[in-house]
Amino acid sequence: MNIIAGINEMQTTARSLKQQGKSIAFVPTMGFLHEGHASLLREGRARGDILVLSLFVNPIQFGRNEDLDRYPRDLERDLGVAADCGVDIVFTPSATEMYPEEFQTSISVSRVSQPLCGASRPGHFDGVATVVTKLFNIVMPDIALFGRKDYQQLAVIRRMVADLSQGVTIVGMPIVRESDGLAMSSRNAYLAPPERQSALALSRSIAAVRNAYAAGERSVEALSRMARDIISQEALLKIDYLEFRNEATLQPISEAAGDTLFALAVNVGTTRLIDNTVLGVCRA
């Protein structure tokens, strides 16, 4: 397994691999890997000749008073996960390598970035789109894999790749959950035991909405009320948003259908957690 920190070395390596006719599968992450990341890596291993993992906590997607400084990091552990999953190259650039002092460019994907997380984290998806574009230019992947837990991020990246003709196949992978239903997230490490117990209300609300939809309920108002009632039973939880949207456009809807995204974000103490489901899709 090759570990590369410099942009020039990574680009030179990628060009050489392309000249050899090798396909590159890419999994961009901020590190502190868990089983959700591992599932992306295993799929990437199956789909590409060369598997590249990036570990980079991207400062420009964090807002003021967010958790950039305390975001969990464990390079040694991450390298162990990477080796176990058959990664060929780990790209570990520094912030100054990615964003030198003269850096000025930003990528913005307008409409799909505005609702949901975009409404409460202004500028976040500009930071995501910018770093992903730069990573694509450096790694030169044929395929890139992302988890569906960050559903809006996936939608932003799909739109960006299509609009800019970036030529990368984007694969969205199912949410991976703990045995008790909590969606895996690097930020789960922040949760104290009582907070983690309260956070299970997110997956309970998703299960309740899916069951009601399967039983014939189509009213978004009724489904929203049901989910909010479940979340509100937990005093430690504060809803940021709880919404039903078209899965492709993220536009609001009034009647649920098979292409309806149910997405929610909840603050648990100082930790922000997100979860989602598409109602017409069988859960993994």
UniProtKB/Swiss-Prot annotation:
Its main location: cytoplasm. (R)-pantoate binds at Q61, Q153. InterPro entries: Cyt_trans-like, Pantoate_ligase, Pantoate_ligase_C, Rossmann-like_a/b/a_fold. The keyword Nucleotide-binding applies. The active site is at H37 (proton donor). Beta-alanine binds at Q61. One of its GO terms (cellular component) is cytosol. One of its GO terms (biological process) is pantothenate biosynthetic process. Pathway: Cofactor biosynthesis; (R)-pantothenate biosynthesis; (R)-pantothenate from (R)-pantoate and beta-alanine: step 1/1. It is an enzyme of class 6 (ligase). ATP binds at residues 30-37, 147-150, 176, 184-187. It catalyses: (R)-pantoate + beta-alanine + ATP = (R)-pantothenate + AMP + diphosphate + H(+). Its EC number is 6.3.2.1. It is found in: Cytoplasm. Pfam families: Pantoate_ligase. The reaction proceeds by a bi uni uni bi ping pong mechanism. Belongs to the pantothenate synthetase family. Homodimer. Catalyzes the condensation of pantoate with beta-alanine in an ATP-dependent reaction via a pantoyl-adenylate intermediate. This is Pantothenate synthetase. It comes from Pelobacter propionicus (strain DSM 2379 / NBRC 103807 / OttBd1).
